[in-house]
């Protein structure tokens, strides 16, 4: 049965301001509910070093999928001096294109000022005057809400010159993307923002030293930045106490796919996937059986029913062979062909490859071709062997960025748990070697 907890500022720092209809919280209501108090506290009573230290103590990790410590990332920015210059940038990664993921859109459309306040506090910590929100181009309504919120924040004196009576200047700009998944990678995002082709960059140099227009740059996710204000309002001890695991705070989590009540909820780290699946999402719809689930987007490995009791956090999901990712899970019922499902996923990643490196550019289309052959049940035994070889050749360290390694995770896990389904797609009467597959690479 679907049963939701009541939201309070002590238990749900990201969503407690929402009413029952989940209307957008504009600045008057946001300020009435302690909005911008954290930013005022930071500007009037803290130094940038104090802010970074507090975020380090909080244990806040990036919510974009990698789970890198936010305070550590901020501390990597070089000092203001003649060597590194006095101009630096903060970029908010709002290019949310992971299939099945909509947590950032939810936060931007429902509590936009929470994001703006998080950006302002972060900008203060990093000595940044200009910040950019790199927004997914298809999020037209989100863009409208953010633009209106920026106008409101400017009118209330939180953006512009002499913010909160200080000598500080803060500006926030919105840049809409052109619909490329690869822009979720921070250096590809930077290239796109500069007007270049959205290819990932070589590292080093890292963006913290050579980023946007060659200046020190920090890139943070929407949900990461939205967490920041509450930490300064309620303290580190409180923030750590929200979680049921070593990962601190709460996380926007959800379930989609073949569940009764697909949705998104703010929940503590460490809650089990089963509790989300059964208590919040209501279990499988139409009395169907769960076949597989992905814990955090299309680029995360498949897990099966026995893994539902795993705590939803970065460490424990990794222990069972997947990644927490965006923490918006997808449930798949037993009527779905695993070969067709993987083919669908790989087609997306093949299409979204930037084409910069050969393994990704040629390997992903090759995988799609093989899966289409298997889907038609005209494959040969060598097809499965080649898929396994491609999983190895497109793995970590073999490609320029993490796009291909992430893309093949669903395939690797599908071969692990459902190899028989792949084998049943092989034509048992075929004595022909896979000439079609071997020759197909010449097309790319």
Curated annotation (Swiss-Prot):
The keyword Ion transport does not apply. Pfam families: Complex1_51K, NADH_4Fe-4S. FMN binds at residues 177-224. Keywords: 4Fe-4S, Flavoprotein, FMN, Iron, Iron-sulfur, Metal-binding, NAD, Quinone, Translocase. Transmembrane segments: none annotated. NAD(+) binds at residues 62-71. InterPro entries: NADH-UbQ_OxRdtase_51kDa_CS, NADH-UbQ_OxRdtase_suF, Nuo51_FMN-bd, Nuo51_FMN-bd_sf, Nuop51_4Fe4S-bd, Nuop51_4Fe4S-bd_sf. [4Fe-4S] cluster binds at residues 354, 357, 360, 401. The keyword Acetylation does not apply. Its cofactor is [4Fe-4S] cluster; FMN. Binds 1 [4Fe-4S] cluster. Its EC number is 7.1.1.-. GO terms for molecular function: 4 iron, 4 sulfur cluster binding; FMN binding; metal ion binding; NAD binding; NADH dehydrogenase (ubiquinone) activity; quinone binding. Signal peptide: none annotated. Belongs to the complex I 51 kDa subunit family. This is NADH-quinone oxidoreductase subunit F. It comes from the Bacteria. PANTHER family: NADH-QUINONE OXIDOREDUCTASE SUBUNIT F. It comes from Buchnera aphidicola subsp. Baizongia pistaciae (strain Bp).
